């Protein structure tokens, strides 16, 4: 055995000993309380037909053929970015291959040596990875803690200051106090970056637009693989920001651009979203019903979103509860440490427009049995 292979095995054995080894699981026929397909777009026949109709109008090659800076650019890609900028009320838009690529490209390039990034302690791993690749000094502030952020911003700095948050947090499901944060950023001349991944579609065009603070946010990131049922992401900001990222965001420069099917899927999903108010209201109704049914149980985190999490400390304990739920043909997955801090392991329930109240009742009956 090669030394490198043994090192891999030893590392995996250590993780197994910590009861935190991840595995790929397939539950094909279970009722979905797991996916990020909040509006059901990933299974929508209407969206499928829209995409097929648009594909039939184009004779371009299937793949993009290269980076956007080489052979991978197209009129469809440019038109999509113009459409997305208008849709999200932004000056400019730049499409990335995924939300991960968008955050890594953005955070690794936007801040230089001497700059500072203050970030909510619960921001996504992709933001952490981007910050690690930057030359900026990066400091967390306590989750949604305005006072702690104020203390951070009071620190003297020589360079540019950025503040990074999510509008809806992926593990806890709660909202960032965006208006308070944006007011602080304006006061301290800090640039606010908001990841809208789990708000897009669930709350219309995102919480930034819902709260009418687009002009106060320096950068927004929207992803298309969740409520929009597609793939890819967009970074929204000024024309200067877009030009900068085209020149310096390595995850944009050094990768093959999205294929035609993905570009068309993104636009069609947005057009479907504009006429899917009833579907969005059905999701919001399910969220309201779920919160009513768990009211008073302090093990559930307080969340106004489609993400509802119940703390079950211990990797083995949360696995056992999820196994019981899965045996009833309900797809709920455990969230283990180190993905979340030790002692904060949980079941993470994702609600959808297509879930029925009977399915929700069945899930909660098993959880409490």
Describe every region a protein language model picked out:
Residues 41-49, 53, 82, 86, ...:
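PLP-dependent enzyme catalytic core of the Aspartate aminotransferase-like
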Residues 41, 282-288, 295-329, 351-353:
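Conserved PLP-binding catalytic core of the aspartate aminotransferase-like
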Residues 2-62, 190:
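N-terminal "arm"/small-domain region of PLP-dependent enzymes with the aminotransferase-like
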Residues 257-276, 282, 286:
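Structural motif of enzymes handling amino- and sulfur-group chemistry
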Residues 212-244:
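Active-site PLP attachment segment
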